[in-house]
Amino acid sequence: MKKEKGSRRKKRVCAFCVDKIVDVDYKDVNRLKKYITERGKILPRRISGNCARHQRRLTTAIKRARIMALLPFTVE
């Protein structure tokens, strides 16, 4: 019996690298909301498609926005 070849997913590119954004701003709430689940968790890199540098900066920006009460810690 022959194995079926799995469909290869297209590699996602980092949206911040494409837009040539160096720093992720914690005040840009609309952009940050794209990388948070409906439960309020930060999306992992393999799902969001960000590079390692921008994923780290995105994480710190989301955490800063949560502390400044721009984003919720959890969604009720």
Swiss-Prot record:
- Is rRNA processing found in the keyword set? no
Recorded hits in InterPro entries, A to Z, give: Ribosomal_bS18, Ribosomal_bS18_CS, Ribosomal_bS18_sf
Q: Which GO terms describe its molecular function?
A: small ribosomal subunit rRNA binding; structural constituent of ribosome
Which keywords, in A-to-Z order, does the entry hold? Ribonucleoprotein, Ribosomal protein, RNA-binding, rRNA-binding
Residue ranges spanning the membrane: these are none
What does UniProt give as GO cellular component? cytosolic small ribosomal subunit
GO terms, biological process: translation
A Pfam family matched in the record: Ribosomal_S18
Reply yes or no: does the keyword ATP-binding apply: no
Subunit details for this protein?
Part of the 30S ribosomal subunit. Forms a tight heterodimer with protein bS6.
Sequence similarity: Belongs to the bacterial ribosomal protein bS18 family.
**Job of this protein:** Binds as a heterodimer with protein bS6 to the central domain of the 16S rRNA, where it helps stabilize the platform of the 30S subunit.
Record protein name field: Small ribosomal subunit protein bS18
The scientific name of the source species is Carboxydothermus hydrogenoformans (strain ATCC BAA-161 / DSM 6008 / Z-2901)
- Its gene is rpsR
